[in-house]
Amino acid sequence: MTEPWNEIAEWWVETVRDDPRDSTDLLELLDELIGGTGGLTLDLGCGEGQVMRHVGAPIVGTDISGRLLTVAADAGPVVRASLPWLGWVRPDSFDRAVCIGVVEMVKDHRRLFSEVSTVVRPGGHLLVAMNHPVSTVPDSEPLVDESGAILWRWGDYLESGSLAQHVDGHEVVLYHRSMGALLEAAATAGWRLEQLIERGPSARTVARFPEYEGQEQIPTILGCRWTRDR
């Protein structure tokens, strides 16, 4: 997995800069979740450091791509590692973890929630902003009925699955889990849900991608804030 992410690092940096769904919209969602938290922060899947720069020090980033970490290192210390493994971190050493646009790229979400609960201290926080599960279902898509209303084809929403995107000959996979599956996995790992936010396409996104017009009430991003109970 490491080599593909290194090969498409430049594509990813440009995507983050150009697409409000991967940048401004998710950062604004993070801002709604982050209030009342603080301290030493772990940025999970930090990529080129967008979130590290937004949140500010003290923060440590981790990612699988050495090329992306070269850019992120300007924002703070970084560690090259493959999620969900966090064995390089001492237990209870972080006050909070942020995971922006990454949960859906990790195949083993249960292990991710479990590993993060080990490295964040009791009472600490996990802040997640991600593609909404409605939008990651294979074969899900908008539909227009006879009246012109835009509806949504759910596909096999309750079944776990994956979507593959091909970039310059490399495969980027998004893993689909239902909302219930995500929340159950987090709760099992000792995370207590404090806040959940759903958002449709922003005006900024609709202006950039006009095909989203009329879909503003269909959720595209999800934000969750958890506290570690144990």
List where the protein language model places each region.
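Short alpha-helix
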Residues: 162, 173-196
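A short acidic, Gly/Pro-enriched loop at the edge of an enzyme's catalytic core
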Residues: 86-97
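Conserved class I S-adenosyl-L-methionine
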Residues: 1-37, 50-54, 68-71, 126-161, 200
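A short SAM/SAH-binding and catalytic strip from SAM-dependent methyltransferases
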Residues: 96-109
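A short glycine-rich, Lys/Arg-flanked "PGG" loop and its adjoining helix->strand segment in the class I
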Residues: 110-125
